[in-house]
């Protein structure tokens, strides 16, 4: 590779990474304009919120739903690999960020907040803080980069472990969350209420 080719490649990658940062900034600004609270209404920031059905859930840096966002990164890396295989990694990351940021904006809209409150056990869910939502997106990026480097079997094993572990501990995980949002099952709702 010539010096000119290397310089072009760096500049091209830089464009994609700047676009990625712009998506995250747009997500944060949009959530602010939607009236989302910047941080937990409690007035402080925790590294980890271990309560599930508490007012602090989805308000701090990480929580029991963080593994779900890491799995999003695994899945979105796979999607990007399938449809943008010839594009740079940063272009695939941009696709992942657009999907994740779009989900975060939808998840924090009145439509989805009300759906969570009526169809799932999340009766006290009022949406994420901007900080938590941004960190959800960052954790998706962590999963994305992990999947880009790790063997597929390891990535799949970690995703399965996350699903089983969070399902066991909090009776919720990515699979159950999607199922209960799209097609609520009363028996699962009752089981989840036993936490």
Swiss-Prot record:
Keywords: Cell membrane, Membrane, Transmembrane, Transmembrane helix. The chain crosses the membrane at residues 15-35, 64-84, 127-147, 150-170. GO terms for cellular component: plasma membrane. This is UPF0314 protein RHECIAT_CH0004233. Belongs to the UPF0314 family. It is a multi-pass membrane protein. Coiled coil: none annotated. It holds the Pfam family DUF2585. HAMAP family: UPF0314 (MF_01514). It is found in: Cell membrane. It comes from the Bacteria.
